[in-house]
Structures are given as C-alpha cells and as structure tokens.
Amino acid sequence: MNLQKEMGMSVMWITHDLGIVAEMVHKINVMYAGFIIEQGLVDDIYDETLHPYTKGLLGSLPSIDEAPGTKLISIPGLPPDLITLPSGCPFYARCTYRRDYCREERPELESVNANGHAVACWRWREI
C-alpha cells in the first residue's frame, strides 16, 4: 500500500470477502455477473447497503457477537450463465425482492447521494 501512495496509483482487489476489503480500501464496487450493481465509499456500503446481492454478501459474514454455531446467511440459487445472460437484472433469479418487471430490463447505476453511492436495482428504495 505504500507503493500505491508513492506512485499515486489505484489498486483493485477482487474478492467475495467484504470483511477484509473494509480494512483495505476507501471505495467499493460490488459486481455481479460482470456488472457493477453497487458502488460507493466503504462506510456508505456498510451502513446503507442498497442492493440485495450486497446485503447477501454482508449477511454471510460471521460476527463475533453471534453465538458459536449460528447459521450464516447464504444467497439462494446459482449465478447466471455468463454466456447467455438474462435481459433484465442479472441477479433476478436469486433475488428475494424480485418482481416481474425486474426480468425485463437491466437497471442502470443510479446515484443515491453526493458521496458517489450508486445502485443498479429497480427496488432499492423499497428494500
């Protein structure tokens, strides 16, 4: 990380472990099936999670406050076939908040605050 500061360059971490990422980065891009579905400052992503996939990733992290043996949350279903992606939201088949219209058109990233927090979900205001 010192080299990053000295050279003024960015570093990209690709991982499913958001617990580790929070200590290493300032901004997060959450991707699903090749699309950025949520992005923002670490605090915004952790404190105001907007996308169901991001909620699932964070919900799957163990907590020191939980009793031993507490079952972790898992995201149901399987990722889509990347060769034949659906036309709508790529997370549609696994989303517990889905509606029929989510299957028809892929949502674009929508800015939700001045810090750059953005989400690609038709229902983010409701969930």
Regions of interest found by a model, annotated:
Residues 1-70:
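P-loop NTP-binding/switch modules centered on Walker-like glycine-rich loops
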Residues 42-127:
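Charged, flexible cofactor/metal-binding loops and thiol motifs
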